[in-house]
Amino acid sequence: MKTKFTKKTVLKFFGILFAILLLSVLILFSVVIGRTFTFKVNRELGQWENTSTIYPYLSPEQREKLLDNFKVAVQIPTVSFSESDQNITALQEFDLLLRRVFPKVFSSSLVRHEVVGNYSHLFTVVGADAGLEPYMLLAHIDVVPANEAGGWDAPPFSAQEIDGFIYGRGTIDNKQSVMGILQALEYLLERGYTPRRTFYIGLGHDEEINGEEGAVKIVNLLKSRGVKLLYVLDEGLTIMDGVVDGLNEPAALIGVSEKGQTTVKLSVSTPPGHSSMPPRESSIGILASAVARLEKNRMPNLFGHGPERATFEHLAHKFGWSYRMIMSNLWLFSSLLSSVLEGQPDTNAFVRTTTAVTMFNSGVKINVMPAHAEAFVNFRIHSSQTVQGVLNRIESTVSDKRVKVEFINGFDPLPIGSYEDDTFGYQIIKKSVQDIFPQVTVTPGICVANTDSRHYTQLSPDIYRFAPSWYKPGDSARFHGVNERISIQNYEEIVLFYFQLMQNSDVRNLPTLRS
């Protein structure tokens, strides 16, 4: 017996279906709107134990002195050209500078100073309570080269002051941290400070060339002594202001991990010959096609598989309404946000393993077919991938037996440090930021560059990468580029940040969440 569908039955069916769909849309809309106005993961802790007994204040004389000290540090060209080529004279001069301008640090009975690897420095600041687990602050003395003829507004090692900014190589990478940490400790010791919790300061001299003689040797020394660290703070991310569309306030991004990296060499060898009788495909052409495939077929967008999602969720309540709705509902709008992020080079680096062809070499004469062509490609690896996984994908993308793929070096992404409400290091850094920058929202982030802290993973599970330098539109070109600079006010803020961090780290326990 056949079922007969009347017009009335069909209309009733579609009416019910439409009602169900409408109800589903209304429920979905209600959930989205509700989360938009209530979603907030950046929660506050309750009453802190007061260990900041020395007020973060700088007298006019201290402000003048710290600026003079910083300028001299920038003027010393501690350049790392390569692993076999460093300015040793400058590193020796920098050692003498530290001893001269920080007399309390070098003479205090609370501070033990050691030179490691000839030019790096390890300071142990002994706390009164040996039962409290120590922490460590990192920075690096060396800088990348700077070409004085490259368009600088002031010579790169002049530390010249222009419109309230100090110009020079190392002002934001990373002498502001080197001098800021020691200047803060100097002022605390001058005011009678005795730490409760032991802490270490590690200043590497070869971070820009992988840190094998500096950071690695400091780590090995601490390991030999059985040292375990509660947390580690190194350079890395910054205070971003005006560089994220829709974000109404500045945000301090604390790097809870950093990307891995690997470099591969692609090479092609073919018989040489005269250019008057060229083969159908040259070594250059074959290699160029392989490189083009790598650039065209990018690594997958992995937004949400690393800490980058938490960055936006922690900032959601600081965006304007439309952006806030998206950030508060990434369970629904994740693909939308990820597609927007991959549209710009600076944000694309947060959502995937990046592919950068950095060197291409071939040819010896214009009328000779080259027998060999080679290219080097650098990959910065997303938190959810590995070196081996990237290598496998390179092989499948190149997919040409004539192209030899050779692994040069690399390492996996770093472990993700905790940023939970009960994580000591993250919360101490967060409080210290808010003490000095009350207008700033703190959020976890991913560091796309590499730092000395990657060598410290055996000493602590919680490693953070942050220095409170302001990062504004146009500043990305200053990192390792032309017109590197820092404002005088910002350098003073950096000194006060470390001043507070050292005192805040003396709390025995974190407070509970504010109800």
From Swiss-Prot:
Pfam families: M20_dimer, Peptidase_M20
Activity: how regulated: Lipoproteins are powerful coactivators of PM20D1 activity in vitro and NAA biosynthesis in vivo.
Entry EC number(s): 3.5.1.114, 3.5.1.14
Residues that coordinate or bind Zn(2+) 1: 173, 208, 480
Pathway: Amino-acid metabolism; Energy metabolism; electron transfer; Lipid metabolism; fatty acid metabolism
Lineage top rank: taxon: Eukaryota
Glycan attachment positions: 50, 87, 118
Keyword Secreted annotated: yes
CDD domains attached to this UniProt entry: M20_yscS
List of residues binding Zn(2+) 2: 140, 173, 234
Cellular compartments per GO CC: extracellular space
Similarity section: Belongs to the peptidase M20A family.
Entry function: Secreted enzyme that regulates the endogenous N-fatty acyl amino acid (NAAs) tissue and circulating levels by functioning as a bidirectional NAA synthase/hydrolase. It condenses free fatty acids and free amino acids to generate NAAs and bidirectionally catalyzes the reverse hydrolysis reaction. Some of these NAAs stimulate oxidative metabolism via mitochondrial uncoupling, increasing energy expenditure in a UPC1-independent manner. Thereby, this secreted protein may indirectly regulate whole body energy expenditure.
Protein name: N-fatty-acyl-amino acid synthase/hydrolase PM20D1.1
